[in-house]
Amino acid sequence: MSDQRRKSAGRRKYTPRRKVCVFTAEGIVPDYKDIKRLQRMVSDRGKILPRRRTGTCAKYQRKLNVAIKRARHLALLPFVSENTRG
């Protein structure tokens, strides 16, 4: 009897919620001038976050990469964070 309780009282399996592409849902295109939105797609070290982490679809991930690189080139977004600078 106690064995059955232990098995049923085990941990529940974690099922991650499916991430929805923000750009598709809101109907917008990634723009290099939208710094707030671009900063959410960049890690604290300054790296571009992957699709599996942000939930963006392939089409908008490619456009997002171009927008982030363009914003970096125009000095709207830093290449690295303040913490990693020497």
Swiss-Prot record:
It holds the Pfam family Ribosomal_S18. GO terms for molecular function: small ribosomal subunit rRNA binding; structural constituent of ribosome. Keywords: Ribonucleoprotein, Ribosomal protein, RNA-binding, rRNA-binding. The keyword rRNA-binding applies. GO terms for cellular component: cytosolic small ribosomal subunit. It comes from the Bacteria. One of its GO terms (biological process) is translation. Signal peptide: none annotated. NCBIfam families: S18 (TIGR00165). Binds as a heterodimer with protein bS6 to the central domain of the 16S rRNA, where it helps stabilize the platform of the 30S subunit. Part of the 30S ribosomal subunit. Forms a tight heterodimer with protein bS6. This is Small ribosomal subunit protein bS18. It comes from Herpetosiphon aurantiacus (strain ATCC 23779 / DSM 785 / 114-95).
